[in-house]
Each structure stands twice: as structure tokens, then as C-alpha cells.
Amino acid sequence: MGKTKSRGRRAEKKNKKNEPGFNEDVSNLDSDVTITNQEPLSSSMSSTSGIPNTFFGLVDNNELDYFKQAESTLNINAFETDEERQGFINSVLEEAQGKELKLVTNQICSKLMERLILFANHNQLKKIFKQFQNHFVSLAFHKYASHVLETLLVRSAALIEKELTQTDEEKLEEAEEEEAEEEEAEEDSLNNDVPMEDLFISMLNEFKPHLTTMIDHSYASHVLRLLILILAGKELPSSVTSNSTLRSKKSKIARKMIEIKDNEDFDRAFQTPQSFKNELREYCQTIIVGLDTKSARELSIHKIGSPVLQLLIQVEGLVDRERSFWHLIFAKDSEGKDSVEESFVEYLLSESVGSHFLESIIKNDGARPKYIERLYKLYMKDRVLKLAKRSTTGVYIIQALLFKLKPVEVEYILDQIIPELAELISIAENQNLDLANKLIDASISRGNYRRDEIINQLFIKFAPNYDIENPSDNTSTEFIENILQLTGSTLGNTRDDWPTAEERKRALFLEKLMEYDYKFVICTWFNFMALPIERFVQMCFHGVFCHVVEKALIVEPEEPKPIQILRKRLLNIFQGQIVGLACNSYGSHIVDSLWNFTVLLPMYKDRIASELLGDSNKVKESTYGRLVWKNWGMELFVRKKYDWKALIKQQEQEYYGETEDSTEKRAKKPIELKMERLAEEKRRQEEMAERAQSGYTKRKLEEATGTASEKKQKLRGRRR
């Protein structure tokens, strides 16, 4: 019988798996990685003249398996001591010696090289740096090697600072420790004597012929931005935080997925030698020679090149008093309106990349205030409201201007926007919440400028049916619904959905409103009471909305009686839910906040404590419950009730400001004044009774001794 023919891709794939030399790990890499494990250099490099397109070799299967296992070992960090980890790193570096260049251009091995650089000591760092010499340009333009190079640059900046600030004694001690730890070849020891500053400058010289090409390259532009930050002595941003100015959004997400964490060298600035300022000046001059006004303006709206130009404008003041990059893009401050410049500024105000560029150069301290004021007065002042209506572009420029212009101009912008604030905010499309945030901050900075109008506009937008002066019991949930968008959110989901960034943004906005004015807190209370209890409890267990509930549990000083009654009604919602909240990671913070929220309400404090005591076993078995038990002083409640009552009394005294250090006295309540009058009257009556008793006793004594009749005779004699 003839042999049947296998059909389909699965059978073909199975046969391919059975072939000798097939590596399944390599075949499962993403489409950017070829079967040879080597990522080819980007197409822009190969097509651009002057950029070396160097091939560093392939990583064979045996090497790949070893380095992949080493990367996994470093990732889980299952070492008992730092010495054990350092010994493992030393062995991996010995195995990788001479192979560094082909490792950094491999997708898997490049992650290993990053980890090795993060953990390497200073001598090992210099060795790796020297292996990259004469190839830095090729690595900067490579998809994977560029990330390794960025990590190496940050560690190098830290080492340069250490060499600058290190005393001779510290250098001698470090040299002795290194000699005791390991015996190196004489050649290596001589090479390690070269200062890191000199090695860094030699690398900078490699990049100088290629700076203009690096500006708009997908990978090399990030390396260039990092070099500029180091030379300028600016803070080197983290590579994983969401607001990092260095990495792209995709890159930051990828680094979180592969679990590469920065060390202490990130998120800080380093001291730099004087030679770095000269190098920064040369870099700026080299870049600006290849630019004219047209190309610079095109670069400012380029998706990749724009962040580089923003950074150059920010740091150029350190080495160039003329601000050449600024005046290459915009006219001088003494010149008037120009039609070409006006068209360019209009494009910046209406395009996403351009508006981000303009917002960045306004926010950063690189541009002089008079430059920004000129652009504002010539091209933006007469249409502030129109720009604020551009919810994806122009409004961000207006927000940036609120904190950079003179006070008179800031108040002018506020006068234009505040009356139209309700119309500018869109609930459905979630637009201009940031504008409301910035208006509140700007108003506070100007001494609460037009505060009441801002509050009214926000209530008109988010709670049009709410009566601010006389809130009623039939208040709906429109306020928190319009802001938090509870319907359609992850609230109440049983699939362990993570709260979205949109929900976090809305929750922070509501918290900001409650901090701004207590009227928003009262409105939030009414909305909480209008919610079904199950829905409110779901908010307490939600990772984002629980913070809204916690922030709403605040008590105003000298609280009037109607507000105190409202506070009691809100506390009734928590009845029967305390134990469940106390045993939850989010709800436990709310129960902790209830301690301060129940000030002047000892009965409610006692009720909550009794509820915790009623199910004490469940509370004490929970990690979060034990913290609540401690914060509420439940041991005193159980064993020393009098001391627990003393804590409540102490809290009330602190609320009234009746402490030993306090100098101001609060206004006393009518009942307290009445009690003081009664006490004073009682004291006066007791004094009168005491005087009467003493007089009676004295007369009796005088009658008994006979002195009273003598006095009468004398008195009669005087009267005659």
C-alpha cells in the first residue's frame, strides 16, 4: 500500500520540528526576529550614506540556550546574597567576553546584556564600554542594541560623577579592594585606569558626523536625547514610568512586560565635568549648521524629531545666549507679526504633534518669558476662547500659558474662559476636564480669582438640578454619574477587570473638586445616599472609586448642626458593612477614615466598634482587618473602655483646637454658654452660703466670749 501524503500546514510544521537543529524558542519569536536570531539593522541605516551597516555575527543555538537561561535566572533574582549574584554575573560576563556586539543585536540576548549592565561593577562597566568602541553609531541605530546602549549611558554618567567626587583615599581603598577580589591581567588593569570621562568623550566624537541623521531616526533619536540630557546635567528619566520623556509609549510598555527595572541611577541628575558643556556646545552647533528655518519648522512637527528639538530648545540656554534654535523657528522678540510665522503658529495650534511641541517649549524653562509673551500677544490673545474650544490641540496651549504669563494676562484668560466653562466641558466625550483642573489651580494662584463663578459653572455642568443653597433629600446621582460615568465603568464587574486610566482620571478630578470647595463634598454625600446601598458598597471595593469615598469622608471645622445631621445619615449607609470593608484592601482605608469622620458622634463610633467586635475572629484573621483593629484602638474598647472614651475626648479637643499649644479660642455653642452660666450661679450661691455660715459662727463665738456687748457700748458711745 502506498504511503499517504501529509497535507496541511500543521503537518509541515511538525515535520520541520523533527528536523535536527530546529530550535522552537527561536521560531516562536516575533516577526521582527529572523531564524538566524539576528535582528538586521534598520532600513533607514542601510539606505543612509555614512551610517555603518555592520554585521556582528550570529548567536548559535547552544549559546542562545545558555544566555536565555542566564537571563531567566537574573530575572527571577533567586540569589540568597549579593555576593552569590555577583559571582553568577562574573561567570556570565566571562562567557560573553568577545561576543558582546552580537549579543546586543539579538532580541533575547539584548535583554541579558541590559541586566548585566545594571548589575555590573565599575571595572566590568568599563570593559563593556570598550567593547562597543568604534561601533556606537551602529548600535544606536539598531532596534535592540539602542536600548542596551541607553542603559550603558546612564550607568556611565553615574560612574563619571563618582570619579569626579571621589577623594584620593577613596580611590586608593577601591583599588585595594579590587586587587584583593580578583587578579586581572596587566593590560586590563592599565585599560581600567582610563577615566570614564575620556571614554565618554571618545564616544561623543563617534556620533558627531551622524547627529543630523539621528534626529529623526526611530531608535537613534532616543540615544541622542539621552546624550543631550547627560551633557546638560539634567535629570535622566525612568525608562518605565508613564510620563518618561525618554522612551516611546510602546517601549515603556514592552519594558514592563519583560520586567526590566531601573536601578538607583535613573530618575536623577548627575554632576558633569566642564568638558561636557563644551561638548554640548559642539553638538548644538553641529546640528544647527545643517538646519534652516524651513527644515527646523518641519522638524518641529515631525513625530520623531520634534522631541529632540524640544530638548535642544530647553538646554541651549546653557551654552548659547543667542538662543539660536528658538530664533531659527520663530522671529526675534523685537519683530512684529509675520504672515509666514502666523501660518506656522496656526498649524502648531491645530495639529497634534505641533501643539505638543508648542506646549512643551512653553512649559519648559528653556524659552525666555518675553519670547512666549510675544507669541501669545501676536497670535493667540485675541482668540483665547476659540483656542480653548479645540479640545485636542489648542486647549493645551492655553493651559500652559496660565502658568507662564504675567498675572494681568492670566486674569484676562480667566475672564475669557470662566463664563463659558460649562460649555467647554463635554461629559460624553470626556473633553476639557484638564482645563477645569488648570483653571482651578490658576484661580488659587491668583488669590481665588472668580472662585464662586468657577464653582457655579461646574455645578451647572455636572449637577444642573442641584440647589447649592438648599440641597434637598430628593437629590439624584447626576453629579457623580456625570463625572465618574459609573454606568458602563468597571464598577461591579466580577471578572477582575483593572480600573481604566479614564476612570482614574475622572476620580482624581472629583477629588480635586472636593478639595477645592466643601459644597462639592455635600453634593457628593447626597449622591451617595441616593445610590442603592449595593452600588455604594461596590464603590468602596473598587480600586479607583474607593478613593473618592475616602476623600469624601471629611469634616469641616465648626460644622453647623444641619451638616452634622447629614453626616449621621451618611454614616447609616455603612451599618452592617463595616466588617466586610475592614477585611478588604481598599475598604479598610475607608473604615480607618471613619474614625475621624465620626468626630463629635460618639454613638456612631461605639456602633462601628461594636460591629468590629461582633465578628472579631474574622477581622483578626485578615491582614487588613488587623490594621483596622489597631487603628480603631479595639483592644482598649474591649478591655479598658474608659481609656477608649478618653481617646474620643482627646479627638474632640483636637477638633475644637483646645490643646496646650493653642492660642485661639473657638466660638462656644449656646448650650455650652448656658452650662457655664449655671455653673457660675451655683458657685456664687455656694460662696454666699459659706459667708453666711462663717458670719453666724463668728457671732456665736463672740456671744460666748462676751466681746459682743463691749462693742455695742462703744458703738453707742460713738453715736452719741
Swiss-Prot record:
Signal peptide interval: none
Comp. bias regions, Basic and acidic residues: 662-690
Location in or out of the cell: Nucleus, Nucleolus
Keywords: Nucleus, Repeat, Ribosome biogenesis, rRNA processing
InterPro entries, alphabetized: ARM-like (IPR011989), ARM-type_fold (IPR016024), NOP9 (IPR040000), Pumilio_RNA-bd_rpt (IPR001313)
UniProt-listed GO biological process terms: endonucleolytic cleavage in 5'-ETS of tricistronic rRNA transcript (SSU-rRNA, 5.8S rRNA, LSU-rRNA); endonucleolytic cleavage in ITS1 to separate SSU-rRNA from 5.8S rRNA and LSU-rRNA from tricistronic rRNA transcript (SSU-rRNA, 5.8S rRNA, LSU-rRNA); endonucleolytic cleavage to generate mature 5'-end of SSU-rRNA from (SSU-rRNA, 5.8S rRNA, LSU-rRNA); ribosomal small subunit export from nucleus
Principal location: nucleus
Claim: Nucleus is one of the keywords in the record: yes
Bias type Acidic residues, positions: 170-190
Superkingdom of the organism of origin: Eukaryota
Region Disordered, annotated ranges: 1-31, 165-190, 658-720
UniProt xrefs under Pfam families: PUF_NOP9 (PF22493)
SUPFAM superfamilies named among the record's database cross-references: ARM repeat (SSF48371)
Biased composition (Basic residues): 1-16
GO molecular function: RNA binding
GO cellular component: 90S preribosome; nucleolus; preribosome, small subunit precursor; small-subunit processome
Pumilio repeats: 95-130, 131-166, 206-242, 290-331, 339-377, 379-415, 530-567, 572-610
Family classification: Belongs to the NOP9 family.
Role according to the record: RNA-binding nucleolar protein required for pre-rRNA processing. Involved in production of 18S rRNA and assembly of small ribosomal subunit.
Protein name per the record: Nucleolar protein 9
Organism field: Candida albicans (strain SC5314 / ATCC MYA-2876)
Encoding gene, per UniProt annotation: NOP9
